[in-house]
């Protein structure tokens, strides 16, 4: 598994994180097999969130991991997210601290390697986020922090108060959802792609050593499902298949 540098040379992590959103209905045995299969491929970076499966994805993962003595906490990198509540987003100090305690309990661990704020809270009080992060960092419950789905100025606002560097921004990115790159190629053009919806997010993150993570990298725009094999992208799928055959791997691998 290839590795990439996280943030400003914090450490190396696998280039592919194992998404755990749809694992809530797995049995303990199935989850154990899932974890071992990932580790055998060098994929030791697991991405969770407190809302995945209503918390069950973390619970099943944590139970399977804790019950297998061959699995060691120091051999994996655990990331989770908080801030989404029923009907609104909440980045208050109280909610962040309560959420992390729940995450740690469900995952059967005493620390997270990385905590992300899942969505921007339009009513956020950045001082509360800073206070929560200080408590989590100083107690050893969270080692590094980041965000998800945030624009540059939202990150700037948080970073004005938060002492710890925000090292990750997880956003939707895939071949069909490639506006982060396309915007930069259509500057000063009268085309739909020239409209910058994200505030030069790609350039901002590169300038500030913030690692961009892609969520749902196989997904089409507007939550239409996977683009692999879709009739909406015949030329793309044909090209992917040609490349996959060349290297004797699956289209998904490419």
What does each model-identified segment do?
Residues 6, 18, 46, 61, ...:
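Conserved, mostly hydrophobic/aromatic
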Residues 21-23, 49-52, 81-85, 117-120, ...:
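Active-site beta-loop-alpha junctions enriched in small/polar residues
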Residues 104-125:
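Active-site groove signature of glycoside hydrolases
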Residues 3, 35, 58, 62-65, ...:
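Generic structural signal for well-ordered alpha-helices
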Residues 124-253:
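Beta/alpha (TIM)-barrel catalytic core signal, keyed to glycine-rich beta->alpha loops juxtaposed to Asp/Glu
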Residues 26-38, 91-107, 153-156:
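Short, acidic/polar
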Residues 1-76, 138, 220-221:
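N-terminal binding-site loop/beta-alpha segment at the start of enzyme catalytic domains
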Residues 19-29, 82-94, 123:
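Active-site mouth loops of central-metabolism enzymes
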